[in-house]
A protein has these predicted regions:
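Start-transfer (signal-anchor) and selected internal transmembrane alpha helices
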Residues: 1, 63-124, 317, 321, ...
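Active-site-proximal, structured, solvent-exposed surfaces of multi-pass membrane proteins
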Residues: 95-98, 144, 730-938
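Periplasmic/ER-lumenal interhelical loops and adjacent helix-loop junctions
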Residues: 135, 139-148, 181, 318-319, ...
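Extracytoplasmic/lumenal acceptor-recognition loop(s) of multi-pass membrane glycoenzymes
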Residues: 163, 536-562, 576-647, 691, ...
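A cross-kingdom signal targeting lumenal/periplasmic-facing segments of multi-pass membrane
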Residues: 182-187, 211, 604-753, 758-762, ...
């Protein structure tokens, strides 16, 4: 009897500990062990009583002896119980640990391999010439990763970069784009394999999405659920937005964040919540902010679905812990948040005017359409939410609300959370709040993966409780979905293909219902049904992922690997030569380009750059100087000898034409000299007039206001005049009288502009500017307009590109002309109207003799830089009475600490954008200067 009781107790104990290993609830072990101990004790007590009576028949025993014997017997029985338990538990724990490890391994590998297969089917390198580079990943992120790799491997600073527009803080770029704990992976690849490094990064993040969602489901209820894990990792958001790799960190951290919130609501423990939220904010502060909003909603809905509303004291206590945990998370992530906020202060917060008015952003039927496979529409501003996460989820989500064993308040809380997320996307004002009070530029609804997460969690709950639901109810939901899909087909949505969306949806739904029938109603075929269901999910997610990437390619185009690798290899052959042979601090640019961020990957200190963490003042300065620069980007177009020399652009790389000539080479051959040539048809011209990054000038520069002038030529003349301290304007650029004629349009005047309007909307209209060269030299064009309308240009009868376009609103080099030659520039209207600023001239020529003289005078004030790195400059300079300003072409940033002769001096701002130092109080002679950079926030 004792042995039987011991065995039963051991079995109960193992079952209890099994629950503990799976659910992580040690209190269950204590209760079960106590019950087992009590049962064993009772069994032992019965046996002992019999033994005692037998002994009593032969000898007289005292109560004390009887008590001692009873305790001994009970201890012996307990020993048998726990001995059996331990022997059984040891093997069980090993099996549980092994099973859990395999489950998590597969949760990682399945989405990893499936996404790789999708890219493989798109002929990605090395199986073709494809790449993962698309949109901003192609134009921005790949260059940021290249700069990060260069800094980590070669000792650069994460605080500052000379490769963005004139130079600027780098922590903002790092905080928004590169702070993921996985970004360092790019250091494991050679720079020629940057596209493969990013592919590896995307695959790893996709695998971790599956792993973390698997951990969450295992936390809720242990077991293998590879299909549901795959639905989250390979959801439309994960596949499409993987090009914005910095957002995927929040996606894989969201399940852990939800797990931590559930733990906080159930037990009051907030350490995990603090750590996960901090990691989310550190990985990407922007999406981290959205996850903080989601945390509030999820915590409230989860708490009130699980706990009594009457215990307000408990709710207040847990909520205070949640608040304290959130504050700690913000404090832990301050090392990223503070530099990010500092970076945003350079102009991102003023980048656009946000409309906070309320309106509905989409119809709800449109939202339902986005729950289907192959429903990609666009990532452009008119795009709808990306919420597809599998037909199984769409089928089982309504089923959850029919579950009889789920309490009504849990269903209400789940419904409220879903409605809140949908309405957040649908209501414009709420959506802007989610996006940090700023309307996103393309790529809308950047938090939509949170909806997919909630949807999948509820679908999983319905799946594991499906035994409580009749199959006919599931079939009814399936029939309703079929009807909805047929209705959508009738509406003929442009982005819903009959084959790739409608038929895949119906086919997947039919196969899921068939597989579900065997899972639910045929015990003998249940395993086959589960396998069939898993296969359907894999095939559906593969097809949907492939369709999404194909549609994405049609929308915004994937870049070819060769286009990136060959361009970098070709240009790097020149830039590496220059950097190896010239150790001074200088800027370098090129007239050929792949993207505006090329300087970051080529180790060039240039002026071309594009990023969301923009410096608005520098972008405006470059635009005022005649370069192509606006919005959040600047590009080396509009280069001219005066502007280039003042900004310290010492080398200009140009491309040889197929006929052996060089593009726009006449001016360079005349003023510059060829410094480096390569075998791949590139040449680098050295500008002997390029000034240093720091040089002395007259303090009159502080009074220059570019807003007072209409054209870049006037501004550059005024700036040089102020630098020299001259009273009379130094006319480096001299205007040329022009005459304008027009055909096919009428004229009028509006707000300081001459307006040309087509007389026939379907006819041609042209405006012609005519001038005659008065002096041999280089002639330039700039036409100011506050209302630009793109036009086609012809110069002396030959096509000459466009003007007033997004990139072509800059100085144009018209070429070299002899005295008496005619310049006839014709503008053909592409729109109905054209506006040109009146009371100004549009064509100027460069006085090369005066230019030579002026630049030699300014060069005498160059600072002799003795050492420099990313955050440090040291040098010497000569000061005299005529030069009261140490002028720099370094963007103004309060993070620069400046010392002259060992004494700290305060910097001043010039031209509303550049750093300078007032040196009027210095004595004549040589002085030393030291500059160190550390953002104020650090």
């Amino acid at each position: 009897g004792t042995d039987t009781a011991a065995a039963n107790a051991a079995s109960a104990d193992v079952g209890a500990i099994s629950d503990t290993v799976s659910d992580g609830a040690p209190t269950v072990v204590t209760a079960s062990a106590a019950a087992a101990d009590e049962n064993a004790s009772k069994a032992a007590g019965t046996s002992n009583a019999s033994d005692t009576s037998d002994i009593s028949d032969t000898s007289d025993t005292s109560d004390a002896a009887s008590c001692r014997f009873s305790l001994f017997s009970r201890a012996r029985a307990r020993s048998r119980v726990y001995g059996s338990s331990c022997r059984l538990l040891t093997g069980y724990e090993d099996r549980v640990a092994k099973k859990r490890s395999l489950y998590l391994l597969w949760a990682f590998l399945i989405p990893f391999v499936l996404l790789f297969c999708i890219y493989l089917s798109r002929a990605i390198y090395p199986f073709g010439n494809g790449s993962v580079l698309i949109l901003d990943l192609n134009g921005q992120y790949v260059y940021f990763f290249a700069e990060l790799r260069n800094k980590l491997l070669h000792g650069g600073s994460l605080l500052y970069s000379w490769s963005r527009s004139l130079g600027g803080e780098f922590m903002g770029i790092f905080a928004y784009y590169l702070a993921s704990p996985l970004s360092w992976i790019v250091c494991l690849f050679p720079k020629a394999m940057m596209t493969e490094a990013i592919l590896c990064l995307l695959l790893l993040k996709m695998g971790i999405c599956g792993l973390c969602f698997g951990l969450y489901l295992h936390h809720r209820r242990p077991g293998s659920r590879y299909g549901v894990v795959l639905l989250y990792a390979m959801s439309a958001y994960g596949v499409i937005q993987s090009m914005n790799t910095m957002w995927i960190d929040a996606m894989y951290l969201l399940p852990l964040l939800a797990m931590s919130l559930e733990r906080l609501a159930d037990s009051g423990r907030f350490r995990m919540f603090t750590v996960v939220l901090a990691l989310t904010l550190l990985s990407n502060f922007y999406i981290g902010y959205m996850m903080a909003i989601f945390s509030v909603l999820y915590y409230l809905c989860y708490y009130f679905s699980r706990h009594s509303l009457r215990r307000l004291g408990r709710f207040a206590g847990c909520s205070l812990k949640a608040l304290w945990g959130g504050i700690l998370a913000v404090m832990l992530s301050a090392v990223i948040l503070l530099p990010a906020w500092y970076s945003l202060g350079f102009g991102k917060t003023e980048f656009q005017t946000t409309d906070y008015s309320f309106f509905q952003r989409f119809d709800f039927l449109d939202f339902f359409a986005k729950l289907l496979p192959g429903s990609y529409d666009t990532v452009r501003p008119e795009g709808l939410p990306v919420v597809y996460c599998g037909m199984l989820a769409l089928l089982l989500l309504p089923v959850y609300f029919f579950l009889p064993d789920v309490k009504p308040r849990r269903k209400i809380a789940a419904g409220v959370l879903l409605v809140l997320l949908i309405m957040s996307m649908n209501m414009s004002t709420a959506d802007i709040f989610w996006h940090g009070m700023s309307k996103p530029n393309w790529l809308n609804y950047r938090y939509s993966f949170a909806f997919s997460f909630v949807m999948l969690v509820l679908a999983w709950e319905a799946f594991r409780r499906s035994a409580t639901v009749r199959y006919r109810q599931i079939l009814s939901v399936g029939f309703a979905l079929v009807c909805m899909i047929v209705v959508l087909q009738k509406f003929d949505y442009e982005y819903l293909s009959d084959y790739f969306c409608i038929w895949i949806s119906l086919g997947a739904l039919g196969l899921i219902l068939a597989s579900y029938y065997f899972v639910k109603n045929r015990a003998a075929a249940k395993r086959a049904g589960v396998i069939s269901l898993s296969v359907v999910i894999v095939l559906e997610m593969f097809a949907a992922g492939l369709c999404n990437l194909s549609d994405l390619d049609d929308d915004v185009r994937f870049g070819k690997r060769d286009a990136y690798v060959s361009f970098m290899r070709r240009v790097r052959a020149v830039t590496d030569q220059i950097n190896e042979n010239d150790g001074s601090l200088f800027r370098m640019e090129k007239t050929l380009r792949r993207k505006v961020n090329d300087p970051l990957a080529l180790d060039m200190k240039g002026i071309s750059h594009s990023t969301s963490t923009l410096n608005a003042a520098v972008i405006k300065l470059l635009q005022q100087m005649g370069y192509s620069s606006r919005s959040h980007w600047s590009k080396y177009m509009g280069g001219n000898p005066v502007g280039d020399s003042l900004l310290g652009i010492k080398y200009i790389i140009e491309e040889q034409k197929t006929d052996g000539s060089f593009t726009d080479h006449e001016l360079e051959e005349r003023l510059y000299h060829a410094a480096y040539e390569t075998e791949n048809d590139l040449i680098a011209y050295e500008n002997p007039y390029a000034l240093g990054i720091l040089y002395t000038a007259a303090s009159d520069v502080l009074g220059v206001d570019f807003e007072e002038y209409t054209t870049p030529f006037e501004r550059l003349n005024a700036l040089v005049t102020a630098m020299l301290g001259e009273e009379e304007t130094v006319q480096l650029f001299r205007m040329v009288n022009t005459e304008s004629t027009y055909e096919g349009c009428s004229t009028s005047f509006a707000s300081g502009h001459k307006k040309f309007a087509k007389t026939n909307a379907d006819g041609n209209a042209t405006v012609t500017l005519s001038a005659r060269a008065t002096t041999p030299g280089e002639y330039f064009l700039y036409i100011p307009s506050d209302y630009p309308r793109e036009v086609d240009l012809t110069l002396n009868g030959a096509a000459f590109g466009t003007y007033f376009g997004n990139e072509t609103r800059c100085i144009l080099d018209l070429g070299t002309y002899e005295s008496g030659q005619d310049l006839i520039l014709q503008m053909k209207l592409k729109e109905d109207t054209l506006y040109l600023r009146n009371n100004t001239e549009y064509i100027y020529y460069l006085d090369e003799a005066l230019f030579n003289n002026v630049m030699l005078r300014l060069a005498q004030g160059n600072v002799n830089i003795t050492s420099f790195d990313d955050t440090h400059i040291a040098g010497t300079f000569e000061s005299d009475a005529s030069e009261g300003l140490l002028f720099t072409t370094i963007p103004y940033d309060a993070g620069w600490r400046i010392q002259i002769d060992g004494k700290t001096v305060a910097p001043v701002k010039t031209l509303d954008s550049l750093l300078a130092v007032d040196i009027t109080a210095l004595s004549e002679g040589e002085h030393t200067i030291t500059m160190r950079y550390l953002p104020d926030c650090l």
